[in-house]
Amino acid sequence: MNQTVKVTFGGNGLTGGESTAADITAFTFAEGMGGNSAVIIQPQINGTDITFMVADTTGTETLKTLIPTIAVSEKATVMPASGVAQDFSGKVTYTVIAEDGTQQVYTVSIVQTMSYYDFESWVFHSAEATDDEGNIVPSDLDYYDPAGWATSNSALVLLKGLLSACPMDAVGVGEADGRSGKGARLVSNDSKGMYMLTVVPKVTAASLFLGEFVVDMGNTLKSTHFGVPYYNQPQTVKGYYKYKAGETYYKTEVSGSGWSTVVTGVPVPEMTDSCAITAVLYEVNDYTTEWLDGVTLYDPATTNIVAIGMFTDGAEKSAFTPFEVSLNYLKAYDPAKKYKFSIICSSSKNGAEFAGAPGSELIVDDIEIINAE
């Protein structure tokens, strides 16, 4: 017996054309809302991680009163909702739900300045190499950076993977046995000397610093964005180091221009490599758009440096040896102004001049910043 069944649907069904976008497009703390005045650097969105910075003096109770303003993809919703105070004394998760039900989870956390670094925690960076089936597999281009520090490792990835200037097993900055637990090992590499849209020097020094490394192929010295926001008056940087100079010191000579550029590594037998550790405090108007780099730090025309100090004894040390860098103040410190601070370690003192010895190795550990009381 044939039957006809009539079905009546209620509500709004999916049509198949709904948006799948489930992104947080902006996350800010507006002035005048809750405890938002404690936020000194607005949130930065990096994938599904969102980080921001508050003043060192910010207490837990204030962190519970921060009120974010959140923008999401069109027709998406977010939970917890925008404009509602959350307890940011710990990590806070937000779930964005797209029109079609697709969900994406974001984690929001605070980044705070530190005065002591033991190099026990390292952050993995994957080159995302894949096999024939598209699965991510380990690669010689993967690397680790010490937590809280920037390194030149991403530049070494280019030298190894794109330019074939260094062997695939070359190490720039990596873990080593430290004075106590782990330390950071910096190695200068033989990068042959060539011209590939930019000058690739004969020797590429490894660098470790407070700040951010953003590859600039037009001028590689501008890749190092030295400095993090700083809210104290640093006086001294202390720590421990070991150093072994490479066998042959080279300088890099460049002639010609454009694709006719010739890059040559010239041995300098009378020179012995040494390491460098520098500390610098400088003034800014904006934390996110201003920095010193490998050019401006050493430029006599730079006028916003407030204090600087350099470790002068970078000779070989076979055992961990204390070092101390005292900052020399060129201008008066004003707590009402904005400052950025960096510690810069290099396996070759003259690396910014494209000079040094392949194989030079610096290991640092237990670095401490002593501030004025």
PLM regions and their residue ranges:
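Extracellular carbohydrate recognition
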Residues: 317-319, 335-338, 348-371
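Signal that preferentially marks extracellular ectodomain short beta-strand elements
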Residues: 221-228, 321-333, 350-354
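Beta-rich interaction/scaffold domains
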Residues: 1-117
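Residues within well-ordered beta-strands of beta-sheet-rich folds
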Residues: 118, 236-242, 278-280, 324-328, ...
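Extracellular carbohydrate-recognition regions
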Residues: 109-160
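Extracellular-facing segments of soluble proteins and assemblies that are Gly/Ser/Thr-biased and enriched
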Residues: 193-286
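Extracellular carbohydrate recognition and processing domains
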Residues: 286-335
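Short carbohydrate-recognition loop motifs
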Residues: 174-195
